[in-house]
């Protein structure tokens, strides 16, 4: 029986996802407001959540699909072998791009970062062989399903083998607690658990939804060195905004690392992986193909990784000073523009000693008079109106920003923050421009998106347009 045709390019890029990337109705978009094809005329500061695929990555995925179409033959065994061969190629390319030794690293592709968290928890259970405690920061700073995935990963014979402790990252006014206080809370829970002979899995986040890094690397290293047989460290690096040296260091220290190619690097959503240092090889499961309900390999996850690698390779080849220059330009333009706003302000972020420019910022929202924090519903309305604007409604450009995240306002009222972030594809585009032209373009686009947010906030309370 001939093998079924591979789906078309757009369908391939959503293959193997869940309701989060399923295309909805006539819009042809997923719940993030993103379609699985390039979209011209859209300026996306939304890489903290999801972005449209770039034209360059689209072409790379098209070439991958054509190659898979030509190489697939009759029989599921051949198809599975082809999937595994391509997964190995992706791993090798990733390692070369990031300066990693493939032989010293365990690796597993996942449909999402959430799935990768579940596997990390399952590996910790294999290491400990008994019930354990997971210690992480507050769930709203990371993926919406991460906490549940960590618990589900501990399930054995129908029973959850892990308990979860969450540490507060922000206070009642939405501002970050001190790094010292957060570290102390992590250490207190870890110390108490180990004293009770309960192993501990510590989750470090690099970066969170608001750009935070916690607990400190110094504390994580102290915990791991103090009781290596009874602790494991998972680094949630889903945003993947760190430098290559940081990723290399995590793996050299034998941490587990969750990452995705679908945030900073602009691949379609559901493009995850779990990495582990060489010490994890003893408990690492056999790397089998990701299959659907009929047992057929999911080539969609490979296609999405093909898109991610397209940007990763080009970005990592840029000189450090070029990357730094455009990140600094983004940070300077955004901080200056928001400082001039009466309805927007930057939310603080824990950086754990990092002094370089940032690519992700969270924005608090107030009414136009600056008197009160916007309610969660008001922030949602501002987000929806800006992200759903059509070209004919805009002067020249249409913008996309990151999804709202629950947070307390400075006045102690429940609110949400919005996010603006620079992506690798946008930085690569800027790097191809003459410097003065690129800086002017970026400043104008930041002025445009912040101005659009201010306009939508001013319209709150007025009748629908």
Model region roles, listed by residue range:
Residues 5-24, 31, 57-115, 123-130, ...:
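Conserved N-terminal alpha-helix of the aminotransferase class I/II PLP-enzyme fold
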Residues 262-357, 460:
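Active-site C-terminal subdomain of aminotransferase-like
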Residues 1-31, 394, 398-400, 409-415, ...:
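Intrinsically disordered, low-structural-confidence terminal and linker regions
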Residues 108-298:
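Conserved PLP-enzyme active-site core in the AAT-like
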Residues 2-17, 67-76, 142-169, 282-295, ...:
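Extended charged low-complexity segments that act as oligomerization/scaffolding linkers
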Residues 315-326, 330-415, 464-465:
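Conserved small-domain helix->loop->beta segment predominantly found in fold-type I
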């Amino acid at each position: 029986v001939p093998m079924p045709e591979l789906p078309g390019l757009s369908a391939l890029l959503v293959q193997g996802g869940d309701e989060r990337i399923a295309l909805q109705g006539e819009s042809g978009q997923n719940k993030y407001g993103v379609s699985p094809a390039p979209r011209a005329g859209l300026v996306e500061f939304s890489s903290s959540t999801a972005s449209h695929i770039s034209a360059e990555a689209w072409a790379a995925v098209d070439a991958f699909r054509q190659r898979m179409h030509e190489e697939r033959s009759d029989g599921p065994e051949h198809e599975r072998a082809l999937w595994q061969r391509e997964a190995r190629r992706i791993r090798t390319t990733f390692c070369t791009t990031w300066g990693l030794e493939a032989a010293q690293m365990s690796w597993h592709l996942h449909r999402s970062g959430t799935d990768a968290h579940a596997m990390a928890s399952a590996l910790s259970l294999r290491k400990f062989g008994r019930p354990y405690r997971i210690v992480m920061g507050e769930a709203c700073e990371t993926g919406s399903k991460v906490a549940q995935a960590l618990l589900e990963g501990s399930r054995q014979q129908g029973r959850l083998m892990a308990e979860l402790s969450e540490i507060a990252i922000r206070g009642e006014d939405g501002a970050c607690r001190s790094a010292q206080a957060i570290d102390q809370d992590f250490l207190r829970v870890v110390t108490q658990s180990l004293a009770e002979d309960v192993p501990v899995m510590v989750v470090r986040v690099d970066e969170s939804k608001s750009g935070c890094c916690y607990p400190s690397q110094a504390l994580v290293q102290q915990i791991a060195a103090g009781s290596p047989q009874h602790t494991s460290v998972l680094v949630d690096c889903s945003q993947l905004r760190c430098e290559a040296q940081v990723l290399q260091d995590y793996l050299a220290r034998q941490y587990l690392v969750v990452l995705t190619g679908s945030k900073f690097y602009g691949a379609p959503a559901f493009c995850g992986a779990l990495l582990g240092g060489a010490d994890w090889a003893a408990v690492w499961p056999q790397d089998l193909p990701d299959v659907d309900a009929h047992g057929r390999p999911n080539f969609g996850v490979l296609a999405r990784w093909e898109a991610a690698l397209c940007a990763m390779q080009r970005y990592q080849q840029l000189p450090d000073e070029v990357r730094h220059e455009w990140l600094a330009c983004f940070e300077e333009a955004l901080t200056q523009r928001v400082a001039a706003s009466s309805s927007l302000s930057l939310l603080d972020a824990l950086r754990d000693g990092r002094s370089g420019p940032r690519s992700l910022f969270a924005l608090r929202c107030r009414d136009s008079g600056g008197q009160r924090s916007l309610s969660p519903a008001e922030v949602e309305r501002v987000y929806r109106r800006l992200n759903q604007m059509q070209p004919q409604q805009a002067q020249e450009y249409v913008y996309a920003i990151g999804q709202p995240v629950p947070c307390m306002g400075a006045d102690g009222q429940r609110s949400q923050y919005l996010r603006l972030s620079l992506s690798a594809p946008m930085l690569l585009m800027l790097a191809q421009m003459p410097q003065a032209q690129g800086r002017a373009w970026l400043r104008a686009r930041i002025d445009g998106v912040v101005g659009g947010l201010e306009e939508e906030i001013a319209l709150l309370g007025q009748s629908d347009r």
